[in-house]
Every structure is written in structure tokens, then in C-alpha cells.
Amino acid sequence: MPKKPINIDEKILVSIIAGSVSDKEIYEKVEKVLIDNNINYDLQIISAHRNPEQLDDYVKNSTSLIYIAVAGLSAALPGVIASKTKKPVIGVPVSAKLGGLDALLSIVQMPPGVPVASVGIDRGENAAYLAIRILDLLK
């Protein structure tokens, strides 16, 4: 269920991609901060495991400057996105199982050349604040 960006006349600056609607509580934290700061964004629910072709197409065609990937369990989503783009990717581990430690470790243990920034477990708001800081560098 993609949401409309804040202002459809402006370029989408941040793409929020969640692996599942079960991550809603976390990606809504991201949305709130972006809305409060007037940052144009897009929200997609795309699983790296169940919808790899859809994810490929989305990343390939996206004009976003930054990706925020919200994922739990094996949390492959941020790394898969990072492998397909040179744009910054911020991973948000979700505390689905093992308190989110499994997701956190999946996000931070990436191979060389596939960088993913990570915020704390369930800290969607910090991912949004980090994205805003990155965008501020472009001003």
C-alpha cells in the first residue's frame, strides 16, 4: 500500500521501504519525522525475499536520494537495496524475534563495497533524522 508523497509536485527525497506491513509501527515513526520536517517521501512495502523483482524495479526506477529500509528477522532488505544503488541506505532493525538483535546484526555485517548505515532497534525516527542530516549536506 504505497502512500502518496507529501507534495506530489516536488521530487521524492526519501524512499521508505518496509519488508512487511507488520513493520508498520516502525515505519510510521519514520513517516512522522519526515512529515514534521516537510520532507517529501514515498512508502513501499516490498519484501526482499518474496518480491525480489518488484524491489529491483523500484530501486532501478526510483529518483529518491536516500533509502530507509525497515526490516526484521533476517533483515536482508537494507543490504539488497544497497547492492543495487550507490545512494545512501539506512537500515532500521525491527524487534520481531530475538529482541531485534538478529535483524541488527544482519544489517551491520555487510561485505565491503555494500555499505548500509544502521540505527538502533526499532528507532525509525532516528533513521529519518539521519536522512534529514544527509539531505542538509546537499543544501
Regions found by a protein language model. Give the residues of each.
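Short glycine-rich or small-residue beta-strand-to-loop segments that form or flank ligand, phosphate
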Residues: 13-20, 66-69, 90, 115-118
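Short, solvent-exposed amphipathic alpha-helical segments in soluble enzyme
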Residues: 29-36, 83-86, 133-135
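Glycine-rich phosphate-binding loop
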Residues: 56-93
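Glycine/charged-rich beta-loop-alpha catalytic/anionic-binding loops adjacent to active sites
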Residues: 39-40, 64, 86-87, 109-116
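Glycine-rich phosphate/diphosphate-binding loop of Rossmann-like nucleotide-binding domains
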Residues: 11-48
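N-terminal beta-loop-helix "entrance" segment that forms/cooperates
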Residues: 43-63
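Short, ordered loop/turn segments at secondary-structure junctions
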Residues: 21, 46-48, 72-73, 94-97, ...
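C-terminal binding/interaction regions
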Residues: 3-7, 18-25, 29, 99-139
